[in-house]
Amino acid sequence: MEFAAKLKAMRQAEGMTQAEFCDQAGFSISTYKKYEASMFEMGYSALTKVVTHPRFKKYTLWLMTGDTAPECGQISPV
């Protein structure tokens, strides 16, 4: 699964709209839509906003590697 699809899967698993995700993560909606559409590659600063957010931390390992470690609280949204 490519990175953009993973972002979308995370957002949907949390039951969030794009606007709600952006509000939580601190992105503009226009920028986030470009991430989900694979038009922009997410840089370190933006990625850090996602993986350090308390609501999304549980997906960090999966987002970065595709792996999970449920025993460590690292899960997949799909």
Give the ranges of each region predicted by the language model.
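A short, Lys/Arg-rich alpha-helix, primarily the initiator
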Residues: 1-14
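Residues within the helices of the helix-turn-helix
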Residues: 8, 19, 48
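The alpha-helix within a helix-turn-helix
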Residues: 11, 22, 51
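Short, conserved catalytic or interaction motifs in soluble domains
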Residues: 37
